[in-house]
């Protein structure tokens, strides 16, 4: 009998704690100071508003997303509803990534590269959350 399943079982709580606490802290930060997120979301929100009438402000959308990430991050960190929490976090990261790391719009090569790295990092985070949801 291999020890791999046992080792995975022992690592799962630590992985959830590390992953979830990151989202909890960052989401809470957005709730406390939504301004930078509102600025980052402006272009994406403007594009959405061209297609759909939204009865909420950009700041409300950013705050709700921050609250969602904080709450689901905390749940994941505590091991409560981990699959659902991971799935919701992955879903919330898609618009966050598209709003915050629009590397394809950057003209400065250095800024473009930095945003591309952050975009790819977020994609990896989404992949990790999906993996956590399946595990």
PLM features: residue spans?
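Short amphipathic, positively biased membrane-proximal segments
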Residues: 1-135
